[in-house]
Regions:
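Pocket-edge structural micro-motifs
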Residues: 12-13, 100-102
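Arginine residue identity/basic-tract feature
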Residues: 7, 38-41, 99, 109-113
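Non-heme Fe(II)/2-oxoglutarate
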Residues: 1-86
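Catalytic core of non-heme Fe(II) oxygenases with the double-stranded beta-helix
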Residues: 87, 92-93, 101-114
Length: 114
């Protein structure tokens, strides 16, 4: 599949199943820590350093997510060489965003992208 022609490419097995499971479990555990800290009032409901629940006006209301999670940032850097090879481009990592979807959650088309 040509990235230049299609403007996208699929990179199969970009990470191992073990690494995918590790990162998924790590993020699920982080959500548990966040939930425990919030329930125990360990930090302010406005604190977002270890994530937050999206509000009613956001893309997926009442869904745990986080910008710049360290595991996701590390994964981004690990995947960069393979993505550069597949696209033929020099890529500059911008940011990571992770979300834990619940049954019934639906991510609609982004309003800020076409």
């Amino acid at each position: 599949m040509s990235f230049k022609k299609n403007k996208y490419t699929v990179i199969k097995q970009a990470i191992s199943k073990d690494l995918a499971a590790f990162v998924a479990n790590y993020f699920l555990m982080q959500k548990q820590v966040y939930d425990t800290c919030r329930q125990s009032r360990y930090f302010s409901p406005f604190e977002t350093i270890i994530g937050y629940y999206e509000g009613e006006n956001e893309q997926i209301p009442n869904t745990y997510s986080q910008y710049a999670n360290m595991a996701m940032e590390t994964l981004l850097l690990k995947c960069q060489p393979g993505m550069e090879k597949a696209t033929g481009l020099k890529l500059y990592p911008a940011y990571t965003y992770a979300r834990i979807y619940k049954k019934g959650d639906e991510l609609k088309r982004h309003k800020d992208r076409f």
